[in-house]
Amino acid sequence: GAAVAAAIYALAANQVKVNVTGVIPMCENRISPSALVPGDVIGSYGGKKIEICNTDAEGRLILADAMAYMVKDEHADRVIDIATLTGAVVGMLGFSTAGLLSDDDAFCGAFLKAAQTSGERYWRLPIFEEQKQMIESKIADIKNMGRDYCGTITAGLFIQAFAQGRPWIHLDIAGTAWTDNPLYQGQPQGATAAGTSSLYYLLAG
């Protein structure tokens, strides 16, 4: 959410003339008598029924609703989601590179060019049909989690399912959003504002 707010602020502060909408989904995340449990099937803003396989894969549920809102209510013609979503991306890429998924080569290329300008590192991950099959459900439209592997990719593909075919980019910044190394890309220790400058350069053209 911070990257979205900061990018929108930077665009406004620099009077960049671009039509962009930022959505920051938020909710409380705590145990209650009505909390999700494995095996639940819940509805979503996009109309899909979701089988809950793992209650720790909860952040993607509100990202899916935000994605559906962008398409349904804001009529977005291109969509990007960004989140500190999975621990799997840290195991794969470490703390200096963020994961990226996209179904549109031109859109992805434009973003990676912007990222090069910003100095941020992203690595595009592959999308194959068998990975999509990992989140197919027999009792709902989709599962909120696949198996114990390929977690970064299946998390992104879950969100993509709510993009309604719009050109889409998914950024998993779980490893790059915070640093304990004060020398990392010239950043002080702490939050890095990961994604903000890349989004800005993409949208500013």
For every predicted segment, state its role.
Residues 1-205:
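A generic structural signal for tightly packed, nonpolar segments enriched in small/aliphatic residues
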